[in-house]
Amino acid sequence: MGLFGLLKYAHRHRLVRSEAISTPPGVLTPIAIDLWNVMYTLMEKHYQETTEDNATTTARCLLRLLRMLHKRTYFPIFVSDRGIFGNGRIARGAKAIMAAAVRADGDGAADAPPRPRWSTMLHAPRIVHRLCVNLIRHMGYAYVDVSDMEADDVCANLYHTNTVAQVHTTDTDMILTGCDMILDIAPVFPLVLRCRDVLASLGVDYSEFLAAFVRCHTDLHRAPDVDSVQQVAESLEGREVAPEDVKLKYASRCPDIMRDAGKALALLPAAGDARSPRAEREFIQHVVAMLTPARHGHLSVLRRVPIVQEPSDVNKVFGSLLRHVKNETRAKELAGLFWKHIPPPPNYQAVLMAYWDDCNAHRRK
């Protein structure tokens, strides 16, 4: 899911860039991980021909992910839809808005349980979700457990509260919420798509982008009613944008996005206009509410979702593997691989302090 055709547009205009890690030695870069998006992507890419059971393949896939994160000096904060165990109910966001719109139209399909997010590739093994989550918990990694939010919204919250520097996912609707994305961490220089580069390419500010490209959101529109990014971009061509304006608009990362988000509603056609479906307006209202800091006296505060980090415990890692793999020898082998290649992660608060405070001070010298 995401913005229909954005990756194609981004590659055509060379907006997907290889990024060198620029933090000082010993400083980890905090990033949000859209867990199931990333795991399914790795499963499809590397485990099509596996003959091992699903639990073993899940463990090996997670091990691959954690090793890549460690090599790139990333500190992951794991995020998933409907809480870390996936047993909540989404009450806000694009999927909830679309479900409510479908129910209002009298389509009973909205009352059906959500379809599992699954690979279209025939031989891709299934992920054992409970095993994956328990390994993350017992290895001592940080995660977010908010049962009524989509992963995309949690990632956007972490990004705009200056908790994470980027979001690792292939869901391009993160750009619509003003976030920078890591598309692939496997290359030595990870592939990154930045919101400000997309805006500069289109010659729009964030409010204009949100108002115009919401019609490309595949969670809000069903084919063939969804527009592609290229279609909308072509409709914007011919507008003159002074070079100095572009420079001013995209000089910073977050403040302009927070400031401009609320203007998007004023750019939409009037409520009730057929050119502005209700779902689009409600989604933009949701994004504005999500990105706008609340006023507390003379302060503006954007609250961060709570982060959980449990102590690492090798016995619980082995127990989780044994429970799902059901082969003691293989469970011991896998537990040994995790403990050999993945050092226990540091406290997330220390990581954030080192990156956002100490690292910024280092850059100013």
UniProtKB/Swiss-Prot annotation:
Enzyme class name: hydrolase
Superkingdom to which the source organism belongs: Viruses
BP GO annotations: symbiont-mediated degradation of host mRNA; symbiont-mediated suppression of host gene expression
Subcellular location: Virion
Keywords, ordered alphabetically: Decay of host mRNAs by virus, Endonuclease, Eukaryotic host gene expression shutoff by virus, Host gene expression shutoff by virus, Host mRNA suppression by virus, Host-virus interaction, Hydrolase, Nuclease, RNA-binding, Virion
EC number: 3.1.27.-
An example Gene Ontology molecular-function term: RNA binding
Transmembrane stretches, start-end: none
GO CC terms of this entry: virion component
Function as written in the Swiss-Prot or TrEMBL entry: Minor structural protein that acts as an endoribonuclease during lytic infection. Degrades host mRNAs in the cytoplasm by cutting them at preferred sites, including some in regions of translation initiation.
Family: Belongs to the herpesviridae VHS protein family.
Protein name: Virion host shutoff protein
Organism: Suid herpesvirus 1 (strain Kaplan)
Gene name of the encoded protein: VHS
